């Protein structure tokens, strides 16, 4: 019965997202909340300038409302769901402020790095202090085994790293039409299956609400995108997926299921280190998806390829997390 409820959860979130988007996009246009495009980015992206951004509000509302209602309906509104809603709200708010500054102040960089980091730290610390001992414990498990390592207060550092790093990694992936929407749906779908296997149905409900919300948004975000999610959506999704991995005790498995996000982040780190130490760039441009664009791949080809890689990694993650 609950498995059917999970499908209903995804369906409801999808319908809300699809229904809200056509109403919200003209509203964003009226407010002139259009995305500005970096001059140093691929030239093909200049035509996207002015496309409405902050569409992540649609994802945010769809998944928050649906997960809350369905968790209450199935009596699974526990500490886990509450923590997930807290992280999603907190990181979504940071993203909203970042987007607002970009579109209103016409500053493409939005919040300063320091301002963003402070906000992310506050949310991560609150997550740890509220959840420790109640929703999760301070050990990590080796995926596919019963081996666990108690980290004690070192786990606090891991939580901060995962939430801040996860939100920024997902944010880096949001550079092509539909890229993040598709990869996020795949990753959250994988974690929902693992959550069901662990009988953590509240977490599963939340994950399926995200799947439905981002797939509904993808209808309008696929190439050519009518709207971008902005940091409002990407930071919220990044913080949420890291929190899900922590609550399921699949911290290490996040590296596999979120492999696309990891590759995007590593490409930026490698690029920066290489340029600062040798004066040469490893990639034509980072994050990685832009490298393939400049290699002559069409935007759609890059997106579908990354979706495919994300799907294969998700299947591997499910196999390790459920059947090994």
From Swiss-Prot:
Domain of life: Bacteria
Keyword ATP-binding: no
Keyword terms, alphabetized: Cell cycle, Cell division, Cell membrane, Cell shape, Cell wall biogenesis/degradation, Magnesium, Membrane, Metal-binding, Peptidoglycan synthesis, Transferase, Transmembrane, Transmembrane helix
GO CC terms, sorted: plasma membrane
Protein name (Swiss-Prot/TrEMBL): Phospho-N-acetylmuramoyl-pentapeptide-transferase
Species, as recorded: Bacillus thuringiensis (strain Al Hakam)
Gene of this entry: mraY
Enzyme Commission numbers on file: 2.7.8.13
Catalytic activity: UDP-N-acetyl-alpha-D-muramoyl-L-alanyl-gamma-D-glutamyl-meso-2,6-diaminopimeloyl-D-alanyl-D-alanine + di-trans,octa-cis-undecaprenyl phosphate = di-trans,octa-cis-undecaprenyl diphospho-N-acetyl-alpha-D-muramoyl-L-alanyl-D-glutamyl-meso-2,6-diaminopimeloyl-D-alanyl-D-alanine + UMP
Family, as annotated: Belongs to the glycosyltransferase 4 family. MraY subfamily.
């Amino acid at each position: 019965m609950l498995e059917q409820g999970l499908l209903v959860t995804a369906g409801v979130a999808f319908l809300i997202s699809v229904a809200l988007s056509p109403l919200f996009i003209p509203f964003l246009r009226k407010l002139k909340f259009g995305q500005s495009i970096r001059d140093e980015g691929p030239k093909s992206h200049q035509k996207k300038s002015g496309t409405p951004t902050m569409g992540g509000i649609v994802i945010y509302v769809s998944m928050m409302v649906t997960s809350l209602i369905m968790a209450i309906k199935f009596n699974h509104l526990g500490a886990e769901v509450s923590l997930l809603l807290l992280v999603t709200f907190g990181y979504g708010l940071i993203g909203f402020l970042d987007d607002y500054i970009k579109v209103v102040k016409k500053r493409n960089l939005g919040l300063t790095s320091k301002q963003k980091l402070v906000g992310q730290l506050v949310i991560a610390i609150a997550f740890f202090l509220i959840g420790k001992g109640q929703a999760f414990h301070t050990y990590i498990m080796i995926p596919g085994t019963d081996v666990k390592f108690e980290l004690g207060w070192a786990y606090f550092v891991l939580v901060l790293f995962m939430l801040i790093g996860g939100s920024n990694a997902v944010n880096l992936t949001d550079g092509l039409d539909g890229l993040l929407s598709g990869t996020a749906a795949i990753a959250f779908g994988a974690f929902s299956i693992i959550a069901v296997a662990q009988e953590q149905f509240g977490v599963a409900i939340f994950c399926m609400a995200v799947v439905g919300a981002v797939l509904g948004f993808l209808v309008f975000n696929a190439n050519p995108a009518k709207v971008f999610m902005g940091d409002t959506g990407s930071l919220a999704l990044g913080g949420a997926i890291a929190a899900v991995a922590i609550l399921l005790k699949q911290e290490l498995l996040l590296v596999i299921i979120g492999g696309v996000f990891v590759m995007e982040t590593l490409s930026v780190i490698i690029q920066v280190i290489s340029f600062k130490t040798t004066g040469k760039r490893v990639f034509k441009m980072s994050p990685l998806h832009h490298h393939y664009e400049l290699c002559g791949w069409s935007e759609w080809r890059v997106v579908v390829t990354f979706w495919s890689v994300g799907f294969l990694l998700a299947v591997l993650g499910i196999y390790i997390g459920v059947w090994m």
